[in-house]
Amino acid sequence: MAPSVISLRSHNSFSLSVSASCIKVADTQDKLIEEWRVASASQEPVLLLGEGSNVLFLEDFLGTILLNRLKGIDIREESDGWYLHVGAGENWHQLVEYTLKCGITGLENLALIPGCVGSAPIQNIGAYGIELQHVCDYVELLDLTEGKTIHLTTEECQFGYRESIFKHQYRYGFAITAVGIFLKKEWNPVLNYGDLAKLNPATVTPQQVFDSVCHMRRSKLPDPVVTGNAGSFFKNPIVTKQHADSILREYPNMPQYLQADGNVKLAAGWLIDQCKLKGFQLGGAAVHEQQALVLINKSNAKGSDIVELARYVRNQVAAKFSIQLEPEVRFIAAHGEVNAIEVLS
């Protein structure tokens, strides 16, 4: 095997100094299949990557990084709305901006979420009351071994909170090539979270929602270009109402969001903040001083520094609230993705 010599610093938003044996760029489906088969034939591990905004490299990757750069935005207008067919390699935030400029509304709450369009279904990205599943029409997937295209409806994607079938059945050997999005012409602003609740639903415009979301994200989340991070490190935990009520008795101002099934979603950042961990540092990694949900590469951190910090944060929250936080970020070891919860346990 070739030595690990190609830097991945610019391909992971934590800006960790890790490397790979090889990096290949695929801008067509044929190229994706070809590079996958070449790497697989040499018995090397292969990792499909978008913009590396939701991964933590624990160490050097001993194989090929395959960058999915399939582009293109096709828009079809119908009487009730717009149907978009978007290449997996398109930047998500740029798509949100583009639709707004075209007078197409519905993606404003998802502004400034980092990463590629193809990564959006994997996590079922969401923010400020909207998730991808609310606007997703279908996902196109490529079976890299058979060379066949698979068309999945929204239901078949099995979307959940930061969850989808792409983390399970289609995790390895498949590449998302395009995402279908349907946006209704009848615009109903979702103004339930943060500063959006201050806006008047009767007069607010899509541009104002977009601007407000961008302002909120920029004010509390560090720019990965300046400070290495992967955004929200942990998922917001969902607990029983009984568990939430027991915490509420001691912390009556705790933010909580009742779910359709009767359970309650809590704010992971708030839980971490109650443990007085903002600014806490281990090795080169630290908890961000403004947003406790974000772990940062403060000073030439290694992957192991971020793991140690995440484990410490998780243990503190568990000790105080009897809640086990789950990472939202995907953990990548030398030969591929590993179970993040097992790494932290």
Swiss-Prot record:
It comes from the Bacteria. Residues 16-186 form the FAD-binding PCMH-type domain. It catalyses: UDP-N-acetyl-alpha-D-muramate + NADP(+) = UDP-N-acetyl-3-O-(1-carboxyvinyl)-alpha-D-glucosamine + NADPH + H(+). The active site is at 162, 232 (proton donor), 328. It is found in: Cytoplasm. Keywords: Cell cycle, Cell division, Cell shape, Cell wall biogenesis/degradation, Cytoplasm, FAD, Flavoprotein, NADP, Oxidoreductase, Peptidoglycan synthesis. Its EC number is 1.3.1.98. It holds the Pfam family FAD_binding_4. Pathway: Cell wall biogenesis; peptidoglycan biosynthesis. GO terms for cellular component: cytosol. GO terms for biological process: cell division; cell wall organization; peptidoglycan biosynthetic process; regulation of cell shape. Its cofactor is FAD. One of its GO terms (molecular function) is UDP-N-acetylmuramate dehydrogenase activity. PANTHER family: UDP-N-ACETYLENOLPYRUVOYLGLUCOSAMINE REDUCTASE. Belongs to the MurB family. Cell wall formation. This is UDP-N-acetylenolpyruvoylglucosamine reductase.
